[in-house]
Swiss-Prot record:
Protein name: Beta-lactamase SHV-2
NCBIfam families: bla_class_A, SHV, SHV_LEN_OKP
Disulphide bonds in the chain: 73-119
Binding site for substrate: 230-232
Organism listed in the record: Escherichia coli
């Protein structure tokens, strides 16, 4: 009897560890919504099978903001694969073509940039003018939306150019997607025959080289983990990230997180997305 009593005491002694463990992903998302006084949309999808692992408001609309730039460069690469575009083609532009936040393109007014360089600038530095120049090559917002329909995404829509597309007005369906649709589209671009293997590798590499996502999931990523991502932001209470993650330096899952309608500061939005990412990673490791 004494032995049994000691075993029970030993077992109970371990329970506080479970009580004080980090919250499960959905618990963290609900906590984030409460702290943000806004809405969170999220999906975690297995890259190989397309199976949904975790989801919250996954079929609700959220502003894409700059996360659309991954899809845009996917559309550009599809044109390259079809022989209608070349990554080496030089595009020249003028001062009046520049919009706010163009840290790369503003330095190349004299010499222009290639299509490939514009894609790199749009994804790795979120250069808005680079995105607009690329958008013109695929037929503008309507052309990009048509590309989405062609690959089976009947939800995601782009209606405006940079920087107006970041307006993120409450209830506005323009320039929006759902976490589920964005994840499915990203998976198609990276795993199906919509793009050649070479173009898939190039799109993924641009996301790996992202240089403006440091405060989000990258800030909580364990050593040796893979990440490729693209973020988006709006002054009107929205923030977002699309990412591929995995241990052992392999892309195994797609994670899409969007926030909207929050009065929280950008730093607070970043912190909440990082917290959701940390909860997903910890749950994954169990």
């Amino acid at each position: 009897m004494r032995y049994i009593r000691l075993c029970i005491i030993s077992l109970l002694a371990t329970l506080p560890l479970a009580v004080h463990a980090s919250p499960q992903p959905l618990e963290q998302i609900k906590l984030s919504e409460s702290q943000l006084s806004g809405r969170v949309g999220m999906i975690e999808m297995d890259l190989a099978s397309g199976r949904t692992l975790t989801a919250w408001r996954a079929d609700e609309r959220f502003p894409m903001m700059s996360t659309f730039k991954v899809v845009l460069c996917g559309a550009v690469l599809a044109r390259v694969d079809a022989g209608d575009e070349q990554l080496e083609r030089k595009i020249h532009y003028r001062q009046q073509d520049l919009v706010d936040y163009s840290p790369v393109s503003e330095k190349h007014l004299a010499d222009g940039m290639t299509v490939g360089e514009l894609c790199a600038a749009a994804i790795t530095m979120s250069d808005n003018s680079a995105a607009n120049l690329l958008l013109a090559t695929v037929g503008g917002p309507a052309g990009l939306t048509a590309f989405l329909r062609q690959i089976g995404d009947n939800v995601t829509r782009l209606d405006r150019w940079e920087t107006e597309l970041n307006e993120a007005l409450p209830g506005d369906a323009r320039d929006t997607t759902t976490p589920a649709s964005m994840a499915a589209t990203l998976r198609k671009l990276l795993t199906s025959q919509r793009l050649s293997a070479r173009s898939q590798r190039q799109l993924l590499q641009w996301m790996v080289d992202d240089r403006v996502a440091g405060p989000l999931i990258r800030s909580v990523l364990p050593a040796g983990w893979f990440i490729a991502d693209k973020t988006g932001a709006s002054e009107r209470g929205a923030r977002g990230i699309v990412a591929l993650l995995g241990p052992n330096n392999k892309a195994e899952r797609i994670v899409v997180i969007y926030l909207r309608d929050t009065p929280a500061s950008m730093a607070e939005r970043n912190q909440q997305i990082a917290g959701i990412g940390a909860a997903l990673i910890e749950h994954w490791q169990r």
